Amino acid sequence: MLIFEGKEIETDTEGYLKESSQWSEPLAVVIAENEGISLSPEHWEVVRFVRDFYLEFNTSPAIRMLVKAMANKFGEEKGNSRYLYRLFPKGPAKQATKIAGLPKPVKCI
């Protein structure tokens, strides 16, 4: 559970929001800080991308899917696992979806 702006925000045991409708960009900053990440414009690009992906496909992207989709949209420079791991060192799919207020990707351990 998180306390944000005086409200209790329910999370699962790993810190993923139970209700993605409670997500906001200011809340994302708090979640990122809990993950040890200070959000840069590059982080926001990925966070917004995974949110859009989720809205379109109704699923959070696992790492392979995330890399491929990022490459299709942004090119090889940003659509590769090295770039994404620099931004999200504990796992791009896990951390980006958590910060984006989405469910944990199905194929993530």
From Swiss-Prot:
One of its GO terms (biological process) is tRNA wobble position uridine thiolation. SUPFAM superfamilies: DsrC, the gamma subunit of dissimilatory sulfite reductase. GO terms for cellular component: sulfurtransferase complex. Its main location: cytoplasm. The active site is at C108 (cysteine persulfide intermediate). It comes from the Bacteria. Changing C108S: Loss of activity. It is found in: Cytoplasm. The keyword Transferase applies. Keywords: Cytoplasm, Transferase, tRNA processing. InterPro entries: DsrC-like_C, DsrC-like_dom_sf, DsrC-like_N, DsrC/TusE. GO terms for molecular function: sulfur carrier activity; transferase activity. Its EC number is 2.8.1.-. Part of a sulfur-relay system required for 2-thiolation of 5-methylaminomethyl-2-thiouridine (mnm(5)s(2)U) at tRNA wobble positions. Could accept sulfur from TusD. Belongs to the DsrC/TusE family. NCBIfam families: dsrC_tusE_dsvC (TIGR03342), PRK11508.1 (NF008562). Interacts with the TusBCD complex. Interacts with MnmA. This is Sulfurtransferase TusE.
